[in-house]
Amino acid sequence: MNGASRVTMDDPNVKTVYCTGSPYDIGFTHGSSVSAEVHHNVEMYSYFFGETAKITWQQARERAVTRFLPTIERQWPEIIDEMRGIAEGAGGGLTLDDIVTLNVRTEIAFTNYTDGCTSLGQNEGEKMYLAQNWDMIPELQKGMVLLHIKPQNSDIALRFLSEAGIVGKIGMNSAGLGLCMNALRSAALNPNNMPVHVMSRRLLQYARSYDDAVAIIEEFGLASSINYVLADKSGKFADIECSPVGNFLIRPENGYVAHSNHFYGPGRPLTLKDHPGADSLTRVARMRELTENDSREGVDATFETLRRRLSDEQGSPAAICRSVPPGAKGIDRLITLGTIMMELTSCTGQITIGRPCEDLPIVHWFF
């Protein structure tokens, strides 16, 4: 690793969008500011759905509207107003149905496929860190966006990395609540529960603590499977493997918890089938090894030492810091697209776009 040393407020390749006001206003600002990126994501997920679920965009849209839109409207009508704003802001013939389809991409595609993300939560003295790499196909980097949102009539502000057109993903809020996400491949699906990316936004917008976040998850349930690493500024944190048939808590040991893309929490029923890639097992084992080594050698958790762990290339190309496998084609061309690190006691974060083992500008988050 050459070291990421250039400090910036914005990334030169991924836009930062500041959104305030009503749900529709937030959506319109989002959509109009990254219109090209929203259209790019529609194009890319049209391809992605064809590869993973063997359906066209039109078929995916019909599935999204018939199975998931009624639930979102019932559980959180304001977020539908925001999605409508995104569609009208992005223009070019996009409709609310298209944006809903983007926001249920996990429910459509990831019951058949999983990406490759590695995440960590670590409590170090008075510091509470969350960190992860987000791995996906290279083309999706062109559709990434950093969203800063201040909803009307709320004292909570949000910062998160997302994909243009998608209302929630990986990030933190000004109350000191943060979340990381790992895809879990499981066929379990319940359209009466909240879709994954809508849930991520709900947590960031309303949870002031770890306990709040757990209560929200329990209240609404997850439409498909996802892993969350959740933490708050008090230092309370844990990993929760969420699924439509139940949630499985993994408590920290030795001051940390690590996860990748397979279920391993206690209590999972045998009927909940898991289909991870082999590298999911090796990546989480390697993250544990690196974390234990640092602890044994007295190396404190900091943004710099976390970045070093997330830059690890042992087992390349399917390493913590991924590179595209030689000869890989289509959706097998996974690579690390971005790294998100958060320290919740100070409500600060550092983000790099690209593989963290390379020399990249650091985007700083604060409130």
Enumerate the language-model features and the residues they cover.
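Internal mixed beta-strand/loop scaffold within catalytic domains of large alpha/beta enzymes
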Residues: 102-199, 337-341, 349-351, 358
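C-terminus-biased signal that marks the final domain/tail of proteins
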Residues: 1-115, 204-247, 252-367
